[in-house]
Amino acid sequence: MGRFIFVSFGLLVVFLSLSGTGAALNCASGWSGYDQHCYKVFDKPKSWADAEKFCKKQTSGGHLVSFHSSEETDFVVKLVSQTLESQILWMGLSKVWNQCDWGWSNGAKLKYKAWAEESYCVYFSSTKKGWRSRACRLLGHFVCKSPA
């Protein structure tokens, strides 16, 4: 009986230590999980288009990160701060020219907004809240997001 309790306690410790790391969501090694999605910060700067292509190659359904709540934003900013110092990072929001409207690179409609100003491709800061835009051709670090 004592051995059963010991093993059960050990399994509980392992489960609790893995929760929040992405392991419970079947995220690939090096990716972190939150709300049915997996996230990874990449520290090799790319243009917005190259970063989006890179994310698509990483996992099935992968794209530059899209934000749908302030809680998700807080999770990603914390993840970034653990990996990079003060940086700006691309996210999947850009001007969809054929519709003259903003849209996420994964096709989701823009419902949650946190604009600081408006332009072409959108980035966020690892130290400040709010979104900003700049020319898509400029290089930036980025976060990829995929379904868990």
Swiss-Prot record:
One of its GO terms (molecular function) is toxin activity. Its main location: secreted. It is found in: Secreted. Residues 34-145 form the C-type lectin domain. The keyword Iron does not apply. SMART domains: CLECT. Keywords: Disulfide bond, Hemostasis impairing toxin, Secreted, Signal, Toxin. One of its GO terms (cellular component) is extracellular region. Disulfide bonds join 27-38, 55-144, 121-136. Residues 1-24 form the signal peptide. Expressed by the venom gland. Belongs to the snaclec family. Interferes with one step of hemostasis (modulation of platelet aggregation, or coagulation cascade, for example). PANTHER family: MANNOSE, PHOSPHOLIPASE, LECTIN RECEPTOR RELATED. Shows greater sequence similarity to the beta than alpha subunits compared to other heterodimer snaclecs. Heterodimer; disulfide-linked. This is Snaclec B3/B5. It comes from Macrovipera lebetinus.
